[in-house]
């Protein structure tokens, strides 16, 4: 199991420069966990894409359904105390720290492309490419 941040889910479901790597990641590790916060973040991404007319409403609804199936039964609440402790120890947002807190709770890694998170939490956060370096 890995923790996947919202951008990883977005890049996996929408065409991106990371698409091939994320397909390989999902094949290697199909068990993706997320804090419940991911839903609001993902909806905000879809709202932006809708407003820029990159996707249609029908496509947005389908993307939510696909995302739901990826993380089915792997949504977790996280401790506010742990999130705030991580915020206090870093310059990351509380949103980002929710993903780190979940990775700590599940004793696994957070896969992210967020440079700040990768820099601030190198023991927990790993990029897509580094995931493959450590898991091959």
Regions found by a protein language model. Name each.
Residues 8-9, 38, 99, 116-117:
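Alpha-helix capping/helix-boundary segments
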Residues 1, 92, 100-136:
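Acidic, PIN/NYN-like endoribonuclease modules and their adjacent C-terminal/linker elements
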Residues 11-12, 45, 120-121:
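Residues that scaffold the ATP/ADP-binding catalytic core of kinase and kinase-like folds
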Residues 42:
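Entry/capping segment at the start of metal-dependent catalytic domains
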Residues 36-39, 59-90, 101:
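Acidic catalytic patch
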Residues 17-18, 62, 72-77, 111-119:
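Contiguous, function-dense segments enriched for cysteine-driven chemistry
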Residues 1-37, 49-58, 135:
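Short, well-structured N-terminal submotif of metal-dependent ribonuclease cores
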């Amino acid at each position: 199991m890995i923790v996947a941040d919202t951008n990883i889910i977005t890049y996996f479901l929408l065409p991106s420069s990371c698409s091939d790597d994320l397909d390989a990641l999902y094949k290697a590790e199909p068990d993706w966990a997320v804090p419940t916060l991911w839903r609001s973040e993902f909806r905000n991404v879809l709202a932006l894409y809708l407003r820029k007319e990159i996707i249609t409403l029908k496509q947005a609804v389908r993307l939510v359904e696909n995302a739901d199936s990826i993380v089915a039964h792997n949504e977790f609440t996280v401790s506010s105390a742990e999130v705030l402790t991580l915020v206090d120890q870093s310059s990351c947002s509380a949103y980002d720290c929710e993903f780190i807190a979940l990775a700590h709770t599940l004793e696994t890694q957070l896969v992210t492309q967020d440079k700040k998170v990768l820099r601030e939490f190198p023991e927990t956060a790993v990029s897509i490419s580094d995931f493959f370096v450590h898991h091959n």
